[in-house]
Amino acid sequence: MSTPAYKRILLKLSGEALMGDDSYGINRATISRIVEEIKEVVDLGVEVAVVIGGGNIFRGVAPAAEGMDRATADYMGMLATVMNALALQDAMRHIGLVSRVQSALNIEQVAEPYIRGKAIRYLEEGRVVIFGAGTGNPFFTTDTAAALRGMEINAEIVLKATKVDGVYTDDPKRNPEAMRYKTLTFDEAIVKNLKVMDATALTLCRDQKLPISVFSIFRQGALKRVVLGEDEGTRVLP
């Protein structure tokens, strides 16, 4: 068995990653494939925590949110992430992967409240911890939640799973000559305004020297390759 490059990781999954080819919602085949890839990493002995977004669900109600108070819309988005967290947990249960959902909003009937010490203990016991409801505060993205939770649980790296296999010099869909960065420094990413994470999350990770890896969750085996330290995606380093 190959030796992982990291002992504990924070995986940031966008809600859109769960849609597959659908326009919104949760695609069952897609979520099943994603949790199988997470299981491969857990089987390597890696401790895995997940922060999940809510765009796949919130997209369906976004037209109704136009003109809505920003804080109210953000709370709706947080609730969408809890729905995704429960869907992830259910998919994990089907393949024998033990997980716990912790929510930054108090919803005790469906999820534990976020408690840092408990989350770390679950990770040490080999359970996957799924963080829902972002930071629990409006005006902060789930990227920022990923950076924050990554620091709190002492993760060695934040893995941002996207639709693109890394960070490019330009949009690869529009410019076929766009080049993928293998590595970047935080300062380079900020100065060049590269779409790694939002500015708050990027600055948090830079200040705490927490590396980020950006990769495509749609490339079979990409998550495992990143964890093994192979040339996959883009790494953003202090």
UniProtKB/Swiss-Prot annotation:
<dbReference type="InterPro" id="IPR011817">
    <property type="entry name" value="Uridylate_kinase"/>
</dbReference>
<feature type="binding site">
    <location>
        <position position="168"/>
    </location>
    <ligand>
        <name>ATP</name>
    </ligand>
</feature>
<feature type="binding site">
    <location>
        <position position="74"/>
    </location>
    <ligand>
        <name>UMP</name>
    </ligand>
</feature>
<dbReference type="InterPro" id="IPR001048">
    <property type="entry name" value="Asp/Glu/Uridylate_kinase"/>
</dbReference>
<dbReference type="InterPro" id="IPR036393">
    <property type="entry name" value="AceGlu_kinase-like_sf"/>
</dbReference>
<feature type="binding site">
    <location>
        <position position="162"/>
    </location>
    <ligand>
        <name>ATP</name>
    </ligand>
</feature>
<comment type="similarity">
    <text>Belongs to the UMP kinase family.</text>
</comment>
<feature type="binding site">
    <location>
        <position position="54"/>
    </location>
    <ligand>
        <name>UMP</name>
    </ligand>
</feature>
<keyword id="KW-0963">Cytoplasm</keyword>
<keyword id="KW-0665">Pyrimidine biosynthesis</keyword>
<protein>
    <recommendedName>
        <fullName>Uridylate kinase</fullName>
        <ecNumber>2.7.4.22</ecNumber>
    </recommendedName>
</protein>
<dbReference type="GO" id="GO:0005524">
    <property type="term" value="F:ATP binding"/>
</dbReference>
<dbReference type="GO" id="GO:0005829">
    <property type="term" value="C:cytosol"/>
</dbReference>
<keyword id="KW-0808">Transferase</keyword>
<comment type="subunit">
    <text>Homohexamer.</text>
</comment>
<keyword id="KW-0067">ATP-binding</keyword>
<comment type="pathway">
    <text>Pyrimidine metabolism; CTP biosynthesis via de novo pathway; UDP from UMP (UMPK route): step 1/1.</text>
</comment>
<keyword id="KW-0418">Kinase</keyword>
<comment type="function">
    <text>Catalyzes the reversible phosphorylation of UMP to UDP.</text>
</comment>
<dbReference type="GO" id="GO:0006225">
    <property type="term" value="P:UDP biosynthetic process"/>
</dbReference>
<feature type="binding site">
    <location>
        <position position="171"/>
    </location>
    <ligand>
        <name>ATP</name>
    </ligand>
</feature>
<feature type="binding site">
    <location>
        <position position="59"/>
    </location>
    <ligand>
        <name>ATP</name>
    </ligand>
</feature>
<feature type="binding site">
    <location>
        <begin position="12"/>
        <end position="15"/>
    </location>
    <ligand>
        <name>ATP</name>
    </ligand>
</feature>
<dbReference type="InterPro" id="IPR015963">
    <property type="entry name" value="Uridylate_kinase_bac"/>
</dbReference>
<feature type="binding site">
    <location>
        <begin position="135"/>
        <end position="142"/>
    </location>
    <ligand>
        <name>UMP</name>
    </ligand>
</feature>
<dbReference type="GO" id="GO:0044210">
    <property type="term" value="P:'de novo' CTP biosynthetic process"/>
</dbReference>
<dbReference type="GO" id="GO:0033862">
    <property type="term" value="F:UMP kinase activity"/>
</dbReference>
<feature type="binding site">
    <location>
        <position position="55"/>
    </location>
    <ligand>
        <name>ATP</name>
    </ligand>
</feature>
<dbReference type="Pfam" id="PF00696">
    <property type="entry name" value="AA_kinase"/>
</dbReference>
<keyword id="KW-0547">Nucleotide-binding</keyword>
